[in-house]
Amino acid sequence: ESRGLGDVYKRQENKELISNISHDLKTPITAIKGYVEGIMDGVADTPEKMDRYIRTIYNKANEMNLLINELTLYSKIDTNRIPYNFTTISAKGYFGDCAEDLSVELESKGAEFTYRNFMDDDCKVIVDPEQLRRVINNIVSNSLKYTDKPKVEITMDVKDVGDFIQIELGDNGRGIAAKDLPFIFDRFYRADASRNSSKGGSGIGLSIVKKIVEEHGGNIWATSEEGVGTTMYFVIRKYQEVPVNE
């Protein structure tokens, strides 16, 4: 019986995925088609208009590419085929580099970014640098998507919590309703889907984030207040050398 229910849930998940993907691919395709038709009909009759049309087409194609990449990664996650390349690195140096990249990106989008690192210089972690950066970028991307205030504020704090390092990524966005908060890391879940559908997104981004954090031996959770903002927390274990008995 439990297997039967599992199959039902799986089919429901797949239906939701197909519905979300259909919507999210259709939106940029419709825009691309419209702008291409405009060029063909001679509407873009000045260099400025032509430049604007081509840039819009390029941006919409990028949106589609990002979605397809997310789906490919999800497929690998679902079959446990993500290739991890773990390495031992300085926590302060690694998260400092991540913050520097974020700072440049957020500044270009007019967002305010604050970074604080409370780790000792000699603290190390075993991580896959590329996959963990995906976690941070995905969370920040989500924050930008669901923040509708004139001044977007993003914070990143890295803290020492015993055997673990805790990373906190906060925003001043619209927040998540208490009823939705327990489910935001579930596959295909979109809080208040009717409102958020205009923002796109397949609803698999945070499930990917959760999987990567757990594969690092950590866990992830969130706190949120509607109208005030959301903070995502995740912890990963510190690297500790095991003394060798002589």
Spans of features found by a protein language model:
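Single conserved hydrophobic/aromatic residue that forms the stacking wall/gate
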Residues: 1-9
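Short alpha-helical segment of the dimerization/phosphotransfer core of two-component systems
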Residues: 59-64
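Conserved micro-motifs of the catalytic ATP-binding
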Residues: 79-84, 124-127
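Conserved catalytic submotifs in the C-terminal HATPase_c
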Residues: 85-89, 107, 112-123
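Short helix-loop "hinge" at the ATP-lid/N-box region of the Bergerat-fold HATPase_c
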Residues: 143-144
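Short conserved segment of the HATPase_c
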Residues: 176-190
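Conserved glycine-rich
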Residues: 217-218
